[in-house]
A protein has these predicted regions:
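Charged DNA-binding/catalytic regions of mobile-element recombinases
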Residues: 1-155
């Protein structure tokens, strides 16, 4: 997650995350030398030797949070809670591919329409301001109808 606009840069789905899998996700998230300067992370076991080696090879400086201190990673903890409350608590997932499709749909909604107080009630991908002209207001369903946004159609 990029902290500046709360953008999700990359996500992966697996039933059994390992250090090797996590290192591969890092390579996929930042190809062609686009890696960030810092990586904030906790002390979970999935960040093992392979992951640490990959981080160093990419020139990223790791910033570890204190043990048992989720408040030090407030943005990502909030995102995980939002995914659970706003999406996964309402959907039955039938495997990894189903979860990947659901999260792809949710992140499209999250980036384009979900408001964030810290962004002055804007979305991570800034929305255009709609004119107040005459016209019908149309409901557009997101995440399979779980969420909605509204647009004014031209008269």
């Amino acid at each position: 997650m990029a902290h500046d606009r709360r953008r999700i840069l990359h996500f992966g789905v697996t039933a059994h995350p390992t250090a090797e899998w996590t290192a591969q996700q890092l390579r996929e998230a930042f190809p062609w030398e686009t890696a960030p300067r810092y990586l904030l992370r906790d002390r979970d076991r999935i960040f093992g030797a392979d992951f640490v080696k990959q981080v160093k090879a990419m020139g990223i400086k790791q910033v570890l949070s204190a043990p048992r201190s989720p408040w030090q990673r407030a943005y990502i903890e909030r995102l995980i809670g939002s995914i659970r409350r706003e999406c996964l608590d309402h959907i039955i997932v039938f495997g990894e591919s189903s979860l990947h499709r659901t999260l792809t749909s949710y992140f499209a909604y999250y980036h384009g329409w979900r408001t964030h107080l810290s962004l002055a009630k804007d979305a991570p991908h800034a929305r255009r301001i709609q004119a107040t002209a005459e016209g019908e207001v149309a409901e557009i369903r997101e995440v399979g109808g779980l969420h909605h946004h509204y647009e004014r159609r031209a008269a």
